[in-house]
Amino acid sequence: TVADPSEQELEKEVKKASEQNRRYIRPSELVAFLLTTFGQKNLDQFVNAYRQFFMISFLGISGRAYGLIVFIESIYDAVDDSLSGLIIDRTRTRWGRLRPYMIITVPIWGLATLMLFTTPQFLSGNTSKIVWAVIAIFAYNLGMSYFNAWQILLYNITPSLRERDNLIATSKFFELFGTWIPAFVPIFVSFMPKISKSIGMQDVYSGFAVAMMVIAGGTAIYGFFAMRERVPLASREQMQEISVLDSFKNAVKNKPMFILMLANFFNGFKSVGASTESFFWLHNTGSLANGTIAGLFTGIPNFIITPITPKLIHKFGARNTAIGAGIFGGIAYTLMFIIGYAPFGSYSGAERYKNFSGGSGVANMVYITIMLTICGLPNCIIRVCQAVLQGDVYDYSEWKYGVRNEGLVATVSNYFTKLANAVTGLLSGLVITFVGYTSHKDALGNVLRDTSPKVLMGFFAVFALMPAIARFLFGIILIFFNVHGKFKEDMMKELEERRLERVRKMTEEEKALESSETNGEIPINADN
């Protein structure tokens, strides 16, 4: 039997696409994507690292109040994401489906960023301070609910799986540079008030907030103009054929999505430990600057590990690589807690948790830096694998139900993320109260160090054990993620065939429409 010429041609195109040799992303787009990643990472790192510390220490709200605000906001954010996901999925503009949200949301989260790190003088009472915090946190997350649609561009900027995976690794590598500027905040906070009495700690935070907002906003606007969306989408008419209810049904039946959501949910508990970083460095070690000093070394291995992560994924698969990274991280954090944060020196009992001062100070600092470096080795591997696995979830949705529905899948995924944020946000505030910490300031408004053994041990326990638990659960749960190996290979081959057929059909329809218009005919819908 002689194969049909059109079938032979389709097979050739599928084979060519499977080889993944074609490059879709232009250099200018790559630069724009990386710059947007850089700007967003700066802002995200700054807000996540210092918002809680600033609001409790300078705005003056309690840890319990902060935790409740974040908890309630996260629940609201999850509900809001239902609407934003549907809107994003059904957006069709001349600029694409996702890019418009990169620019229209900037004023919202930009103004909210400034509010997060400002303490106006008219906020005299506790109630007014809480209201200010509520408005700032809600507005920031509302803007980010839509702005974060740009992250889905990662799966739409190129149809090439290999190019996409390389872009993921490159962007995660570039994110490392997005942590540098926020990392220097403690240095400026520690020394600027000593250099000039007119500059307080909170002035430094406010100044950095302006800088982060300008960087993130500027790179987002540039990215809007420089990037394109290339993966063929269902038309507006096709999207309307699928009801909102059916879209939700398809999303909730996506097994790989729920496994990944559950893994990310528990992995998010690491942020409870991260939320105590500023408290740990200031009170346990005696200076916020110690965190920056340690950070200069702990991040170095990431510049080596991130570029080789695609090779690990190619050899072991994204799922297996993520499992190994999670288990490794859990073991490392557990060992750090067992050894303690100040193992050197002659002191014992309560004095064991005083600070890093004295003859053992340097040795303790070297030790904690080495341990944090080891604990952080899987960080970038996990971030790259999470992005790759999220792409697998989108591809699975398209393969299973015929429509990518990325916005809605991302929305349902974000439910667990928001739930994790709600729980971790509540815990982050409550643990500060639970360990017995109360903020005290000097006459200039600068925070004084707490030397209570109970408080210091509490900070370290949260700092080390929460990340350990998070990493262990992340790795164990991903064992049940089924989009890998031969199943994934067969799925992607079938998807490539469908996409090529969709593009061919769209091309034929466009040619038929042009021909009918040229001949003065009225095009007839074939379905009618």
For the regions a protein language model found, what residue spans apply to each?
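Membrane-embedded alpha-helical bundles of multi-pass transporters/translocases
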Residues: 2-510, 514-525
